[in-house]
Design a protein with these regions (language model features):
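Family-specific signature for flavin-dependent thymidylate synthase
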Residues: 1-282
Length: 282
């Protein structure tokens, strides 16, 4: 099995292998009480039950393995998911690629004024072009410096060692890795990295990876979307505010309009939590 799709200018996602399927999850769950495989519909219902009630061990019986080419700054976010096994291309042993990520103009935005780790909007096209050109010029200078440090035949000593020459490369430089993870933790990765709050570049990779895995475990993927990815979690304070709304207002639309009045009641929610609650109720 090999599925491949290009991502961005020089990257790609390849689904190299997958061990197990929906039936593997159901079989692993049923071994707890000694019953064998049942029908597909029974298996689907069981898988949905497992995901809904957070019985995660059976999902760990399925594993997926990818070959990825991605910018170093995206690789750093991927490596944060420590339950995965990975092996990365080595700049000590080999010469790094000349490929560097240059964002498309529609990806170039100013820093958000409300989110310290996100992008805003409203940047003019002229500034987008200037920023893109600066990124492109800087990566060209870095690659030129890298080539110089590596040396050539005219340098008697053969150039600087690879492990030090690579230090001038930008985090936009592309690297490659093999990445293997069980399905439970893969879904956790997808929930975080496909979220709108994640950096757009890691979102792009995560969405491609998920769409490749989805047809291989349709029941588990359906349950993930229903009970995890598209679900909404409520805190105790949010539930208190919601119960207040149901008792005090005829409908949710009226409650949202009058939410400022409800905010005067001490539910223990910060201003940001109030804003998040409104978004959940819309």
């Amino acid at each position: 099995m090999v599925k491949e799709q290009q991502v961005h200018d020089h990257g790609f996602v390849r689904l190299i292998d997958i061990m197990g399927d929906d039936n593997s999850i159901a079989d692993a769950a049923r071994v707890s009480y000694g019953e064998g495989t049942r029908s597909v519909s029974d298996n689907r219902n069981l898988v949905r039950y497992l995901v809904r009630h957070k019985h995660t061990s059976p999902l760990e019986m399925v594993e997926v393995k990818f070959h990825l080419k991605l910018p170093i700054f995206v690789m750093r976010q991927l490596a944060r998911h420590r339950t995965a096994s990975l092996n990365e291309y080595s700049g000590r042993y080999s010469i790094m690629s000349n490929d560097c990520y240059v964002p498309e103009l529609n990806y170039i935005q100013p820093q958000s004024q409300t989110n310290n780790q996100g992008r805003g909007d409203g940047l003019s096209d002229s500034w987008k072009v200037k920023y893109q050109q600066t990124i492109r010029e800087f990566k060209d200078k870095c690659l030129t410096a890298y080539d110089f440090l590596l040396g050539n035949e005219s340098v008697a000593h053969g150039g600087l060692t690879r492990e030090l020459a690579r230090t001038v490369l930008p985090v936009s430089n592309y690297t490659e890795c093999y990445w293997k993870i069980d399905l439970h933790n893969f879904f956790h990765f997808c929930r975080l990295r496909m979220d709108d709050h994640a950096q757009q570049e890691i979102q792009d990779y995560a969405k491609v990876m998920y769409e490749m895995v989805k047809p291989e475990v349709p029941a588990a993927a359906e349950a993930f979307e229903d009970y995890i990815y598209n679900s909404v979690n409520m805190s105790r304070m949010e539930m208190d505010a919601l119960q207040y709304a149901m008792k005090s207002f005829p409908d949710m639309k009226t409650y949202i309009k009058n939410l400022k009045n409800a905010e005067d009641i001490n539910f223990g929610l910060s201003k940001r939590e109030w804003k998040e609650l409104v978004e959940k109720l819309k």
